[in-house]
């Protein structure tokens, strides 16, 4: 068996490199087609996300697929030079490739460790390969094991339950302390940059359905609002939006507060005493800190939220050794299972060969004795032959099983095939 991976990720390739090595849906389909033409009996799974591009190739023997074959495949399918692909894609083989896949699926190799999206992306990549008829017993086994490993890490550690980004902490931990649910609450988000986009994603996932994006550029506000099913307004209408808001969020890059304390106090007075949660995620701050003293107003600023992120990060780091131990156990288990499956046919053929020789020798012996032994004596002779055969076979078979359990049976496996003439099909 051979398993090889070539790939790059945010760890080792800048975004401009990853962009040139990423695959569109059509390019993925073309890659599977070309791979099938070149390697009819080999297997391939292709994982392409915004943070990583990885190809997992497998074959029944080391000669069936080389790492250079995968590099050539990527270069041809993406119309890139071979040197460019080779210089920016890391090669992993065997155990290293399996361990890497398990780390990826368990979200231990992600930009944000513990984020849940990557496991579904790994599953989708396998499903695409399966639909293209490019999977087989090796990729099936290793991706099944990766899925099992990821679920163990999720259930046996708390590494996935700690939010690390400011928007995720703000929406996932702070908002539930003030509102039982976001559905029906008027959410006014100021800004239309990356922080605003990430915050909107968490808001939508949290059930928010009454959103408004306010920005100096109405065009940018509208573009972001359209993506998330929100209203769009210019900064000219900010005061009116504040009066309506239940949740007010600041993510702009303005150098001064977008509304001063006295203006906010006047607007809050028009709200009829309704509770308002203000999340100031901006640097510099979008809101004067004194608005937190207003009646019914709960203000959380970037430093409050960053402190929670840092606490969560420390808690996640404490869980890392436990998660890594699970990865190591599953990698060991995968290779033990693989080796045991490989040794099973050899052990069976060895037993069959010994039983055949034993039966032939018993038949020859009883023929020479020419009926001079009774049934009881023949049974004793057969038992003696059985004991002799078992004692002779036990050491090599036990050694083979032990080596398989340790993942090192290849050398002994080949030696037994050669010594006992068991053939490659075993």
Curated annotation (Swiss-Prot):
Q: Which reaction does it catalyse?
A: (S)-4-amino-5-oxopentanoate + tRNA(Glu) + NADP(+) = L-glutamyl-tRNA(Glu) + NADPH + H(+)
- What are the protein's GO molecular function terms? glutamyl-tRNA reductase activity; NADP binding
Write down the top EC class of this protein: oxidoreductase
Q: Which SUPFAM superfamilies match?
A: Glutamyl tRNA-reductase catalytic, N-terminal domain, Glutamyl tRNA-reductase dimerization domain, NAD(P)-binding Rossmann-fold domains
Q: Where is the site Important for activity? A: 100
Please list the residues that bind substrate.
49-52, 110, 115-117, 121
Q: Which Gene3D superfamilies match?
A: Glutamyl-tRNA reductase, N-terminal domain, NAD(P)-binding Rossmann-like Domain
Do the record's keywords include Aminoacyl-tRNA synthetase?
no
Q: Which family does it belong to?
A: Belongs to the glutamyl-tRNA reductase family.
Which HAMAP family does its entry note? Glu_tRNA_reductase
What the entry says about domains is:
Possesses an unusual extended V-shaped dimeric structure with each monomer consisting of three distinct domains arranged along a curved 'spinal' alpha-helix. The N-terminal catalytic domain specifically recognizes the glutamate moiety of the substrate. The second domain is the NADPH-binding domain, and the third C-terminal domain is responsible for dimerization.
Q: What else is known?
A: During catalysis, the active site Cys acts as a nucleophile attacking the alpha-carbonyl group of tRNA-bound glutamate with the formation of a thioester intermediate between enzyme and glutamate, and the concomitant release of tRNA(Glu). The thioester intermediate is finally reduced by direct hydride transfer from NADPH, to form the product GSA.
Listed name of the protein: Glutamyl-tRNA reductase
